[in-house]
Design a protein with these regions (language model features):
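Ribonuclease/tRNase effector modules and their secretory precursors
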Residues: 1-96
Length: 96
């Protein structure tokens, strides 16, 4: 089953702010080689999760922030991964 987030509340924001389409973020979430960081180091609540994965459509490594609320996975934000997140992704890929 594919991993997808509900972007109904934050998808337009992410697209406007970071030029990341929700479909690209969902591709990164569903990447079998994704890196999941729980909790996201920047999370103020400690509930957000950072996933670093590959989007085939965007042809980029994308960092995606999600939050589970009432049993549902909500997309919070996403952007092209910075050099640190890209390094984590590539190191995980080599370790396997």
């Amino acid at each position: 089953m594919a991993v997808t987030a509900d972007w109904s509340e934050r998808g337009e924001y992410m697209l406007a702010r970071h030029s990341i389409h929700p479909a690209w973020a969902n591709e990164a979430l569903d990447d079998p080689d994704r890196v999941v960081i729980t909790p996201d180091p920047a999370s103020k609540s400690g509930r957000a999760v950072r996933t670093i994965g590959w989007s085939y459509t965007a042809n980029r490594i994308i960092a995606v922030i999600t939050l589970v609320d009432n049993g549902r996975l909500h997309g919070v934000n996403g952007w092209v991964a910075n050099s640190s997140d890209q390094r984590l992704y590539r190191e995980e890929d080599r370790d396997e």
